[in-house]
Amino acid sequence: INSICLLPKKQGFCRARFPRFYYNSSTRRCEMFYYGGCGGNANNFNTLEECEKVCLGYGEAWKAP
């Protein structure tokens, strides 16, 4: 698994509420959270699909030719 995906969820220290996705290593799933807009870490994806591609290996390889 990509080491980025093992980082804890970090909402950041600003007060915005951007819906983002992170990989939860306890549940082994990508889950939604609200990102504050600054700070945080790399376990922070714009879409569920992006999170699953990086952390679960889903994506291009799973698409039909």
Curated annotation (Swiss-Prot):
Q: Domain named BPTI/Kunitz inhibitor: which ranges?
A: 5-55
Query: Where is coiled-coil annotated?
Result: none
User: Does the UniProt entry include the keyword Disulfide bond?
Assistant: yes
What Gene3D superfamilies would the database entry show?
Pancreatic trypsin inhibitor Kunitz domain (4.10.410.10)
- Lineage, top-rank taxon, reads Eukaryota
State one molecular function term (GO).
toxin activity
Q: Which UniProt keywords apply?
A: Disulfide bond, Ion channel impairing toxin, Nematocyst, Potassium channel impairing toxin, Protease inhibitor, Secreted, Serine protease inhibitor, Toxin, Voltage-gated potassium channel impairing toxin
Disulfide bond entries: 5-55, 14-38, 30-51
Where does this polypeptide localize?
Answer: Secreted; Nematocyst
Principal location listed in the UniProt entry = secreted
Site description Reactive bond, residues in chain: 15-16
Query: CDD domains given for it?
Result: Kunitz_actitoxin-like
Q: Which Pfam families match?
A: Kunitz_BPTI
Cite a GO CC annotation. Answer: nematocyst
Q: Which family does it belong to?
A: Belongs to the venom Kunitz-type family. Sea anemone type 2 potassium channel toxin subfamily.
Q: What else is known?
A: Negative results: does not inhibit voltage-gated potassium channels Kv1.2/KCNA2, Kv1.3/KCNA3, Kv1.4/KCNA4, Kv1.5/KCNA5, Kv1.6/KCNA6, Kv2.1/KCNB1, Kv3.1/KCNC1, Kv4.2/KCND2, Kv4.3/KCND3, hERG, Shaker, HCN1, HCN2 and voltage-gated sodium channels Nav1.2/SCN2A, Nav1.3/SCN3A, Nav1.4/SCN4A, Nav1.5/SCN5A, Nav1.6/SCN8A, Nav1.7/SCN9A, Nav1.8/SCN10A and the insect channel DmNav1.
Q: Which PANTHER family match?
A: KUNITZ-TYPE PROTEASE INHIBITOR-RELATED (PTHR10083), SERINE PEPTIDASE INHIBITOR, KUNITZ TYPE, 3 (PTHR10083:SF376)
Describe its function. Dual-function toxin that inhibits both serine proteases (trypsin Kd=124 nM) and voltage-gated potassium channels rKv1.1/KCNA1 (IC(50)=0.9 nM). The activity on the Kv1.1/KCNA1 is selective and reversible. The toxin presumably acts by blocking the channel pore in the open state.
Task: Tell me the protein's name.
Answer: KappaPI-actitoxin-Ael3a
Recorded source organism is Anthopleura elegantissima (Green aggregating anemone)
